[in-house]
């Protein structure tokens, strides 16, 4: 997949879909708080000076020096739950992100959040 230690270097990389179509630029990576595995990325989409951040899954993703390729298609990614470019993910928004991609969502054993940004 990729070396987790290099994630900070990815910010600003173009994110492309499984067919090479550009989705947007990588903004941040969200980790599963239980496993510490990178789980979702936020990708900036929309016009410069505006736009929003959509969540795309990192399972099956591949990184190269020029881009991050995810396994979802561009339309599915752009229709994904989003936050404003200055926004924060609320705990109540986590189930919708997982559900959009058909992934199971479970809160932690003590009710803690599932996703944390780095």
Which stretches of residues belong to each language-model region?
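Peripheral interaction segments used for macromolecular assembly
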Residues: 1-118
């Amino acid at each position: 997949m990729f070396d987790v230690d290099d994630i900070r270097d990815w910010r600003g990389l173009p994110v492309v879909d499984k067919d090479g179509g550009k989705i947007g630029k990588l903004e941040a990576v969200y980790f599963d708080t239980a496993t510490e595995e990178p789980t979702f990325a936020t990708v900036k989409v929309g016009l410069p000076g505006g736009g929003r951040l959509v969540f795309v899954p990192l399972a099956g993703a591949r990184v190269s020096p020029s881009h991050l390729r995810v396994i979802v298609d561009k339309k599915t990614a752009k229709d994904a739950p989003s936050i404003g470019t200055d926004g924060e993910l609320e705990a109540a928004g986590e189930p919708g992100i997982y559900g959009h991609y058909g992934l199971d969502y479970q809160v932690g054993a003590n009710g803690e959040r599932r996703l944390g940004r780095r």
